[in-house]
Amino acid sequence: SPMPVLAATSPTDCFECAYMASKIALEHMTPVVLLTDAFVANGSAAWKLPDLNDYPAINPPYVTPDMAGNWTPYQRNEETGARYWATPGTEGFMHRLGGLEKDCITSAISTDPANHQKMTDMRQAKIDYIANEIPELEILGNPEADLLVVGWGGTYGHLYSAVESMNAIGKKVAMVHFNYINPMPKNTEEILRRSVSYTHLRAHETLS
């Protein structure tokens, strides 16, 4: 099933990514995968406890009293595709919960192939919309680079150091690094299409 995927770049970035993963999960009513790795787990850094007032507010799509009577469990926001959240015990919004796939409107268990495809398409559209709310990619390093290095997650520090070292000896190297893997930032295609002007495009998943 389509779902958002984030990757933390460093120990200090873990809080930021966890907060944003929670914001996406609660506002868009979707599971979120947050990736870390050995570089992040075994690293350390000084980190100041942040002021949560400096972070964007989390606004779940709760049901409202005026929706009672016409509400269905899988009713969605037309713009975002997110389902409305009726917390257990809310008067007028009784519904069933479970892990099996449900009818796209009623929440009754469904094994109908057409309903399954429709639900998958709706989930994908919901995930695609999230790209409107995440930051765009930033190109680091030499803006006139011959080589673009692409990385994600805990490889950030190693790749950035390598890019800086290469530029220091006269090589022309740039870098983009992904925190948001699904959906990708909206300018991803634009940046990677520029690779036609790069002599080389190199993606790194691990370091060796």
Spans of model-derived segments:
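Generic long, charged, amphipathic alpha-helical segments
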Residues: 159-191
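Conformationally flexible catalytic loops at phosphate/diphosphate-handling active centers
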Residues: 32-138
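Conserved thiamine diphosphate
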Residues: 1-33, 37, 58-69
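C-terminal substrate/ligand-recognition segments
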Residues: 148-159, 166
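Single conserved hydrophobic/aromatic residue that forms the stacking wall/gate
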Residues: 203-208
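Short acidic, glycine/serine/threonine-rich loops at helix termini
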Residues: 16-19, 43-49, 160-161
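Generic beta-strand/beta-sheet core signal
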Residues: 8, 33-37, 150-153, 176-178, ...
